[in-house]
A protein has these predicted regions:
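Generic hydrophobic alpha-helical scaffold/packing signal
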Residues: 145, 232, 236, 257-258, ...
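Juxtamembrane and boundary regions of transmembrane helices in multi-pass small-molecule transporters
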Residues: 6, 91, 126-140, 145-158, ...
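Hydrophobic transmembrane alpha-helices of multi-pass small-molecule transporters
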Residues: 1-60, 64, 177-302, 318, ...
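Membrane-embedded alpha-helical segments and adjacent helix-loop junctions characteristic
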Residues: 27, 34, 38-130, 272-277, ...
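Transmembrane alpha-helix interface/packing and boundary motifs in multi-pass membrane proteins
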Residues: 14-23, 99-109, 140-151, 236-242, ...
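Alpha-helix N-cap/start motif
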Residues: 44, 90, 131, 172, ...
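Hydrophobic alpha-helical membrane segments of integral membrane proteins
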Residues: 27-32, 109-117, 136-137, 148-152, ...
Length: 422
């Protein structure tokens, strides 16, 4: 049995186990991770590389930064201020998604989510609304916001690089031609019909970020300093390129500053790290690596694209590429999905004599639609435990958003980027 076939079998196993959740999600991820080593698909170093992935390091750091906001009561104070202005659940969803979406357009969507997750949990605690109904719109908005500018997500730059090789390019905000209507439609959906699809889970008793605490005895300087360090961490992420320090390291500096200044104790810092999230994300990265390294992902793409024939309609090609990227990105990283699909799409479009921009943008936008699984993007995984989400929760709330993104994209792309411009 080939390595690619074994990988696809592990993918099938993971999907089934994630859907029915007979065993915890993190345990399923570790079974896949270890299974890929035992079967010889991956070596130990590659299989476990996910646990030192930059996103995992960022998770750990931001769990501590978020933990400090809760331990000091600052998250609740911020929540009280926000709920004073946004009094209904609907207005909170609109406000959160709008702020996160716009921030994510110029910042890392993972970084944006990591900074704002503890704030939103504080808002939920103060307002009395279920955090599960606020966190999922937050991470979805972070993904949609990545399609507002050239630097919003790594996949955007991959397509830009491919276009550059044939003397074409996207403008800095050209992605927003499609991305902004999708963000607006997504916000409108979750503020209306989609509200009923958002999960409504109570906070678990063992939750590290419980808002039911007495903060009267916490020194005010700790509250102020926790907020100052959060703001400085956010500023560091905004100016990541200028200062030359990676997001995950900026997060680590913030976490260390909180511990060294005594804002949060080492014990509370360790308690705030959600190991279930770490095991889920780190373990499933091995599956993403296997899909990439064995060529299993490429096989799927080639089979689907090949089924279209030698001269497919550019409209059909764009739709199929979009949907294929949507499916793949929910199990592989969106960067890997885009990197895999962009050369294939560019080659086919050029062979047809069509302008490749619509197809490439379909590839990038589709590759960002990781809304249907908890492993589709790092931000999804970060809120699994805090929101008490299951695999089915993501599918129920996320699949309609994929449908909305598909319809919006298929209407706008051929108009904004004609296949055969005059």
């Amino acid at each position: 049995m080939s390595a690619a076939t074994i990988t696809l079998l592990f993918l099938l196993f993971a999907v089934v186990m994630f859907v029915f959740e007979k065993i915890p999600l993190g345990v399923t991820s570790m079974i896949v991770c270890i299974g890929l080593v035992v079967t010889g698909v991956l070596d130990v170093k590659t299989a476990f590389a996910g646990f030192i992935d930059s996103n995992v390091i960022l998770f750990v750091a931001m769990f501590i930064v978020g933990g400090a906001l809760f331990e000091t009561g600052m998250a609740n104070k911020i929540g009280g201020i926000v709920t004073h202005f946004a009094k209904s659940e609907r207005s909170l969803i609109v406000a959160i998604m709008s702020i996160v979406g716009l921030m994510s357009g110029v910042l890392s969507n993972t970084g944006t989510a990591a900074v704002l997750i503890p704030v939103v949990i504080g808002i939920a605690a103060k307002s009395g609304y279920a955090r599960s109904k606020l966190l999922m719109p937050l991470v979805f908005a972070a993904a949609m916001g990545g399609n507002l500018s050239l630097i919003g997500a790594p996949g955007n730059l991959i397509a830009q690089s491919a276009l550059g090789e044939i003397g074409m390019s996207f403008g800095f905000f050209e992605y927003a031609i499609v991305g902004l209507p999708i963000l607006a439609a997504g916000i409108l959906f979750y503020a209306t019909l989609g509200m009923k699809l958002l999960p409504n889970h109570p906070v678990s008793d063992d939750d590290a970020f419980s808002g039911e605490q007495d903060f009267n005895n916490v020194p005010k300087w700790k509250q102020v300093l926790s907020l100052v360090i959060l703001v400085l961490t956010l500023l560091g992420m905004i100016f990541e390129k200028q200062i030359g320090i990676k997001l995950n390291i900026i997060g680590c500096i913030g976490a260390l500053a909180l511990i060294l200044t005594g804002v949060i104790s080492e014990k509370d810092a360790l308690k705030s790290i959600d190991l279930k999230t770490i095991f889920l994300f780190g373990g499933t990265l091995s599956l993403a690596s296997a899909l990439d390294k064995t060529g299993a992902g490429a096989e799927i793409a080639n089979i689907v694209i090949g089924a279209l024939g030698e001269n497919p309609s550019p409209y059909v090609l764009t739709l199929v590429v979009f949907l294929l990227c949507c499916v793949m990105t929910n199990f592989m990283s969106n960067t890997a999905t885009t990197a895999l699909m962009v050369p294939i799409c560019l080659s086919i479009a050029q062979g047809m004599g069509a302008d490749p921009r619509a197809v490439l943008m379909a590839c990038v936008i589709g590759g960002s639609c990781a809304y249907a699984t908890p492993i589709g993007m790092p931000a999804n995984t970060m809120v699994v435990s805090a929101g008490g989400y299951s695999f089915k929760d993501y599918a129920k709330a996320g699949l309609p958003l994929i449908l909305i993104a598909t319809v919006v994209s298929m209407v706008i792309l051929p108009i904004a980027f004609p296949f055969f411009p005059q």
